[in-house]
Amino acid sequence: NLIDEQAGAIGFDEYMNTALYQPGLGYYSAGCQKFGSDGDFVTAPEVSKLFSKCLASQCSQILDDFEESAILEIGAGTGIMARDLLLDLDQCNSLPDKYYIFEISADLKQKQQKLLKQSIPKYIDHIIWLDTLPERKIKGLIIANEVLDALPVKRFKKESNLFKEVKVTFSDNKFCWVNTTAEPELVDSLM
């Protein structure tokens, strides 16, 4: 048990990462349909191409300022927004040199690759999937649609001028919050 292995509590980021992305078990990694009318929720790019068209219009204004440009999409879902955005950017003569997709879920990454290879094969050489966020700066844009709530994050709170990390424990057959002393790195990042 992960919580027992971590002395009775795990960071919320680890809990969230396990719940969402654990291979074969996590919400985004268990293979069931999540997006669209047959899934649990629908995002704007799946309803209409208008969202991506509007985004492409704004992106083209920014990308045109760079000799070499890139877009980094964080959490590309089914890949529909990436597909439509690249098609619209090409129509605006603003196709980026690179289109990076940072995707944690191997299942979603596979779906994105299948969709994009089948639907826009002429752009596939522009698309690069990343397993980690780039350490070097990109010249261009970072975009994310309906993804912030699916990123594993640490939780913290301030009590009596001290930062506490809010962790997850398991007690009486239920998950519970527990406040722990925050690691110095977390405190430094908050200051």
Task: Name each model feature, range by range.
Residues 1-74, 78-132, 136-138, 156:
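Rossmann-like AdoMet
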Residues 128, 134-191:
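Class I S-adenosyl-L-methionine
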